[in-house]
């Protein structure tokens, strides 16, 4: 489903409206927010209004130059990482189109480079992982320990009416499988209290996101 692209000015008006209604934090997500031509301006506008700003991205177009430019305006950097290996990422379709056509992905190397540089600049770091039938048996604990994010959000693959109904059934995991994945990683990372692990099952997500 295609929606009209929001203009620069309309986006700033929306940000101002939510800020004036008492919202103090704003998170830019997608799709892939880094593909939007007005994203940088909107983040800067939100920060100038005093809001806490964050983004969730797969790392597209996230250059060192952009990270340096945005450091005064962007508080939290979130990266979508679903697996501990790029073999799994290739199966899940997380990678650049050319890579995926060859049956490969270099997503982890790109994320590692972004995270290393972003942490030097002092960004807050979040990881987002969607648990599906492809990665439900994966162990991400070593990878998460190596990156030491401030927060790791773990989501259950969510069916969305009119968006992914035709594709999601083969990827869905049961509530029990999701809980097992979450508890397993909480236990393995129990010695790292500085990593906040937050799990959101389907019920939680339906009640959280508009």
Regions found by a protein language model. Give the residues of each.
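N-terminal pre-core extensions flanking Radical SAM catalytic domains
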Residues: 1, 207-209
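Short, compositionally biased "basic patch" segments
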Residues: 1-4, 71-85
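Conserved alpha-helical substructure of the radical SAM core
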Residues: 1-54, 62-68
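Acidic (Asp/Glu)-rich catalytic clusters
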Residues: 19-20, 69-74, 119-120, 144-148
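A short helix->loop->beta-strand "cap" motif at the edges of active sites that frequently abuts
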Residues: 23, 50-51, 74, 120-123, ...
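Hydrophobic faces of well-ordered beta-strands that scaffold small-molecule active sites
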Residues: 26, 53-55, 77-79, 125-129, ...
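Active-site beta-loop-alpha junctions enriched in small/polar residues
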Residues: 31-33, 58-60, 82-84, 130-132, ...
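Radical SAM enzyme [4Fe-4S]-AdoMet core and its adjacent flexible, acidic
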Residues: 87-207
